[in-house]
Amino acid sequence: MDKNISNQRKSNRIQTIIKVVLLCDYFQYIGTATNCSESGMCIDTPHFISPNSNIKIILPIQEEELNLNARIKRTEKRSNIHDAIGVELLSPPPNYFGFIQNLQSSL
């Protein structure tokens, strides 16, 4: 990773493999959150979603689902069939921060 990019991060990334649902413009997509932080996520998905799009992420944690509003900050081509999207979370709920703390404590 480019040092300049890592210095620009608002918070540390935690490696994950979590299935998520993405809602964008009346469409529903499946993705995998490959890392999470207090301010964003990287999600692998077989669907292209335009940068600057606002999306909703449904993140299953234990017996509940977190509904997170986010904005696509970047896209990255990973292969012929998969893209990665970097998202910025918009006003995540308090229980999302609890989820991140649980991930950090399990490292």
What do these predicted regions represent?
Residues M1-C36, G98-L107:
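N-terminal helix initiation/capping motif
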Residues G31-T32, N67-T75:
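Short beta-strand-centered aromatic/proline hotspots
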Residues T16, Y29, I55, L66-L68, ...:
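Hydrophobic core residues within well-ordered beta-strands of beta-rich domains
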Residues L22, N35, I72-R74, S91:
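A residue-level detector for short acidic-glycine micro-motifs
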Residues I18-L22, S53-E65:
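Short conserved beta-strand and strand-loop elements enriched in small hydrophobics
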Residues C42-T45, R78-L89:
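Short, solvent-exposed secondary-structure boundary/capping segments
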Residues D25, E38, T75-N80:
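Short, conserved beta-turn/loop elements at beta-strand boundaries and strand-helix junctions
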Residues I14, I49-P51:
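Short, well-ordered loop/turn sites that connect or cap secondary structure elements
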